[in-house]
Amino acid sequence: NKPYNIFVKELISPAKESQGFIQGIKWRGTINASQRTEMQAAQNVAQVFLGLNLKCASCHDSFISDWKLEEAYAFANIFSDTTLEINRCDKPTGKMAGRKILFQELGEINAEAVTSERLKQLADFLVQPKDGRLYRTLVNRIWAQLMGRGIIEPVDVMDNEPWSQDLLDWLA
């Protein structure tokens, strides 16, 4: 038993004994140029903790959301020991990805820091109560499990309008 914010921090920026979430992604390996393990880590963190689906944006600008290919790669690059080259539909673009968190208002990742420090920064940004996105995502998932439908639907598209913003804010 531990507070949720500590649990999330340990999953995203793991100590040796809690590396399963991030390291567990590596068993699949690199699927194709757009689905490197770093991109898979970014997709998982975005979906689980932020309620965002980056799968389309990992290959091309998303058709189902406003997320862009460069944003998905910049987020994936936080998880990478080397600078990722952006691939559009498995074809190299010749552009190198930056390193940025998906929501700039949460803070700025030190692009020059080593991977472990970037993951610590990311974890710290995600759990801060200032933005509350992590907690809204959690509340929405629990509500959906208990009530059969989320306050925001689908639960992996937290950019959609909630049917009750006041309730979501209060619960989070």
Language model features with spans:
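Short, structured secondary-structure elements
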Residues: 1-109, 119-123, 131-172
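Glycine-rich phosphate/pyrophosphate-binding loop
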Residues: 112-115
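Cell-envelope and extracellular/periplasmic
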Residues: 127
